[in-house]
UniProtKB/Swiss-Prot annotation:
It comes from the Bacteria. GO terms for molecular function: transferase activity. It holds the Pfam family Glycos_transf_2. This is Uncharacterized 55.3 kDa protein in thcA 5'region.
Amino acid sequence: MDWPGGSLVQMGGFGDDHDRVGADGPPATAFEAATSCSTTGYVPYDHLMRPARLPDGFGIRLDPKVRTYSGGRVLIGGSPTRMLKLAPTAAAMIGDGFLEVVDQQSAAVARHLLDSGVANPRPMSTPSAADVTVVIPVKDNQAGVERLLPVLKDLTVIVVDDGSEVPVEPRRACPGTGTITVVRHESARGPSAARNSGLRSAQTRFVAFLDSDVIPRAGWLELMLGHFSDPGVALVAPRIVALDPYGTALARYENMRSSLDLGRKEAAVKSGSPVAYVPSAAVIVRRDVALECNGFDESLEVAEDVDFCWRLQAAGWRLRYEPVAHVAHDHRVQFDKWFARRAFYGTGAAPLAARHEGSVPPMAMSFSTLFACIAAATLTRSGLASALGALLFTVYRLRKMFNGLSQPTRIAAILTAQGFVGGFWQLASAMCRHYWPVTLLAVIASRRIRRLAVAAAVTEGLVDWYRHREPGGLGPVRYVFFKRADDIAYGAGLWRGAFDARDWAALKPRITK
């Protein structure tokens, strides 16, 4: 790939045989990733990214999971996984894994490494907080506004009261502070309309959307604003953590596995990647870009934040997830309300599938991975032999791509093994979450499938507990109970949404050759 100043970076594709997919888990069939997230799919917008030169002083650092070979001239990583070959000049720029932009060449290399997902930004400058307006959409939550506003005392704030029965009075909540403007809707129009009203009323370069049930932690704004020193970034989101992490058992589960908490790892936000979207409970956007993209879709009652992220991405903008910045959320911890909310989230998959074709498959893997997983799951001699044969063929096929590197067979074998584990994880998750009604019917009909389903439900739950365990969190037994209830609720909503829409695209797996 030619960049100003010479051919410094070449991105080696792994051929059309390999899926460009990703989500929360290890790669499957070497270059797929297992998914437990309903909004995961392929990455359709990479080629649309706008050219935007990084400023001098901007830094990047290689992601810790990226593997380097040939003295740093070959990088394997990113999401989806890819191989990048660096010219000696480019490799020298990132000798210790860090690159600072100082000229056009280093800016081009840094941009490509960022967009490939093998590096993360290290901004050197931060826009002023005076350039930010905070928009708080609220309905019938005076207490939440009273709790939130004191944290924002030095910022310009717009409170959008979306038809509350008793009008919200922010001045009562926080007297004597900075500029607070109230925009009232006479009747409730929904959170998207409330956010859009605040967006149109703001006059600053950046708008921070904060729901009335959140509390930002110290330093949240500065950590997020730094990413906007990259002119190609349109949205930044913090990590959503629990406001009360140690209450009831359900509160502790939410602290470990909230659908709003996207984890500890910083990432670009891309459809089909480990962080496919960010929740709108707390985000900062460029105001002009959000207006250009028509803000949030007011016709959507659910998943409007996912749709907004993907439309920004389709317009060529970059989005970042910054987990060092924390915003605490008052999670629902009454079981009936929590269960209903999880089911409500599931109904959002159908409208997303209609708007963003191919972006919400419950499973995404190659046929060879699916075949190997199903064959191995039979636990028969012929099945295990067939699975081994499929894996050996994958190693052979991948090895040819790594000719010229040291130990190409070892590299191919590691990636294949990771892919196989990822495929199993993806299949087990889908059985318990997206396809649990089908699994239930199969369990009734077959004793062998019954044993397999129970083993998958227990094993997947325990592994998920281990990956998300927190100090003071739930033990494995109660965690698995809540995880399975979580999956049943979401899956029920998924099927109901598809049935109501008479559109089954959200239930279709993507199986490639």
